[in-house]
């Protein structure tokens, strides 16, 4: 295969939420048989057809960087992890739909990846909000993915989906909820597959085709993160 242009997408979230299983499913179209904890960072690649079905269609490599660890790690660990955050073109934020804490921690993960000094714990502002204006120069596309959808009891699903909708609004990102052990959640033509393709197209456009900075939506165009949506039971 001829050499392809590539983009770098971080896959962030707490340990145990299913990032490795998700990346394996996205890149190999197979269920990961024996997932293990990621130490440091693991990278896998998938081929994506940008603007598929149009005259502008072009194949790109999508590098998916599965970053291990936790947001509560010591500063030395965060500093080491910061090397993975260089030259990022997109971020997939992954949380466990059965674990509200993993959803709350996505705010800290995003700040760690996007802050220049990699010390997000120092930029919490009043009323429990994170100030997006501190990242005004960033225009990194985000995608929110909730895992273990199959493990949510039927009588709890509406509450969980309401919570993820607030998350999606906070991050100004589309959301996908799935079960990483079931490839049908990402079947071709499904709404999830369309959202995923749209996200990768956006990442590629920002990296290769956007030249006018005024067209790049910054964090100042979006409202602040609001923890109320996550702390309410």
From Swiss-Prot:
SMART domains: RAB (SM00175)
Keyword Nucleotide-binding attributed: yes
Residue numbers spanned by region Small GTPase-like: 1-233
Molecular function as annotated in GO: GTP binding; GTPase activity; protein homodimerization activity
PROSITE patterns cross-referenced by the UniProt entry: RAB
Example of a GO cellular component annotation carried by this entry: endomembrane system
Keywords recorded for this protein, A-Z: GTP-binding, Nucleotide-binding
GO BP annotations listed: B cell differentiation; intracellular protein transport; natural killer cell differentiation; regulation of protein lipidation; regulation of Ras protein signal transduction; T cell differentiation in thymus
Residues bound to GTP: 16-21, 148-150, 179-180
Magnesium found in the keyword field: no
Highest taxon of source: Eukaryota
Alphabetized InterPro entries for the sequence: P-loop_NTPase (IPR027417)
UniProt similarity note: Belongs to the small GTPase superfamily. Rab family.
Biological role stated in the UniProt entry: Required for KRAS signaling regulation and modulation of cell proliferation. Regulator of KRAS prenylation, and probably prenylation of other small GTPases. Required for lymphocyte development and function. Not required for myeloid cell development.
Record note on quaternary structure: Homodimer.
Name recorded for this polypeptide: Rab-like protein 3
Taxonomic placement: Eukaryota, Metazoa, Chordata, Craniata, Vertebrata
